[in-house]
UniProtKB/Swiss-Prot annotation:
Its main location: secreted. Coiled coil: none annotated. One of its GO terms (cellular component) is extracellular space. The keyword Transcription regulation does not apply. Residues 1-21 form the signal peptide. The gene is KERA. This is Keratocan. Plays an important role in generating and maintaining a transparent matrix within the corneal stroma. Belongs to the small leucine-rich proteoglycan (SLRP) family. SLRP class II subfamily.
Length: 353
């Protein structure tokens, strides 16, 4: 493997797992200090209540089998890494201000979630239920949710209309579950008008999912069995910026002539597929990952999104391709890098071959 660095550093466009929602500190700073004078500072004996963070309750890593009674002042509840099997209404009777619940790494099943208990948490913004025993997306959910994390469960079903009222949801993480194509219907994601990040990686999909919300910016579909990109698929998600399709079964025949020639896509990851040639790309693309495919040669004249003549004289035309990072290792390509690649992509900072 050879890396050619054309510039001293590679600027990353954005963090892979970032979504643009309020942080805990931002929400915490909204509080009026006098707010706490209305509450007593009781603390469940199994948990820790930091004096400097009075609206947080830490009950993680305690071997708990059930959720303790939550004091009324609590906004942030940490219950991860326990043995909890059920979510009942009783512990939350006074917890009307909850914004954040972390229940990752427990033993919660769908049958263990009392009907309606989650939807009654009307101020909840963040719900973490990763690494549990869920077989379907729990319903109903709080209408104000901004992030829903359900990774590494056993989810194979998504109830009809479960997301229809979640207009504020910006991030939905369903990666590493048991989802088949049949679980994702044309109306599955209906209502998710604010969604920006959708993660369905590490499932059992053979097709691109139907009806992705139009405002989606980051779409993660790694580690599925997807073979085909439908014609004009990305016209329905015109804002998609970051697209991951690593570890699928994409071949040259499964990609339409201009399947990835999409001006919004800035980071395209197609590693570990079955491609023998580089698909056409858009001049706006900045990062392209094509490592571990079956590519034998690279023709810069063919893959250049503008004519080589224009690229050579980009100062005159002002339409230089923006590609900065190109990864081609794990293919059958031998150095050196063709000169026409360097002529076309004059902003390249690194090429891995």
């Amino acid at each position: 493997m050879m890396t050619l660095k054309v510039c001293p550093s590679l600027l990353l466009l954005f963090l892979v797992h970032s979504v643009w929602t309020r942080t805990v500190r931002q929400v915490y700073n909204e509080l009026d200090p006098e707010h706490w004078s209305h509450y007593t500072f009781e603390c469940p004996q199994e948990c820790f209540c930091p004096p400097s963070f009075p609206n947080a309750l830490y009950c993680d890593n305690k071997g708990l089998k059930e959720i303790p009674a939550i004091p009324a002042r609590i906004w942030y509840l940490y219950l991860q890494n326990n043995l909890i099997e059920t979510i009942s209404e009783k512990p939350f009777v006074n917890a009307t201000h909850l914004r954040w619940i972390n229940l990752n790494k427990n033993k919660i099943t769908n049958n263990g979630i009392e009907s309606g208990v989650l939807s009654k948490l009307k101020r909840l913004l963040y719900l973490f239920l990763e690494d549990n025993e869920l077989e379907e997306v729990p319903a109903p959910l709080p209408v104000g949710l901004e992030q829903l994390r359900l990774a590494r469960n056993k989810i194979s079903r998504i109830p009809e209309g479960v997301f229809s009222n979640l207009e504020n949801l910006t991030m939905l993480d369903l990666h590493q579950n048991n989802l088949l194509d049949s679980a994702l219907q044309s109306d599955t994601f209906q209502g998710l008008n604010s969604l920006m990040q959708l993660n369905i990686a590490k499932n059992s999909l053979k097709k691109m999912p139907l009806s992705i919300p139009a405002n989606t910016l980051q779409l993660f579909l790694d580690n599925n069995s997807i073979e085909v990109i439908p014609e004009n698929y990305f016209s329905a998600i015109p804002k998609v910026t970051f697209l991951r399709l690593n570890y699928n079964k994409l071949s040259d025949d499964g990609i339409p002539p201009n399947g990835f020639n999409v001006s919004s896509i800035l980071d395209l990851q197609l590693s570990h597929n079955q491609l023998t040639k580089i698909p056409p790309i858009n001049a706006h693309l900045e990062h392209l990952h094509l490592d571990h495919n079956r590519i034998k040669s690279v023709n810069g004249t063919q893959i250049c999104p503008v004519s080589i003549a224009v690229a050579e004289d980009y100062g005159l035309y002002g339409n230089i391709p923006r590609l900065r990072y190109l990864r081609l290792d794990g293919n059958e390509i031998q150095p050196p890098i063709p000169l026409d690649i360097m002529i076309c992509f004059q902003l390249l900072q690194a090429v891995v071959i």
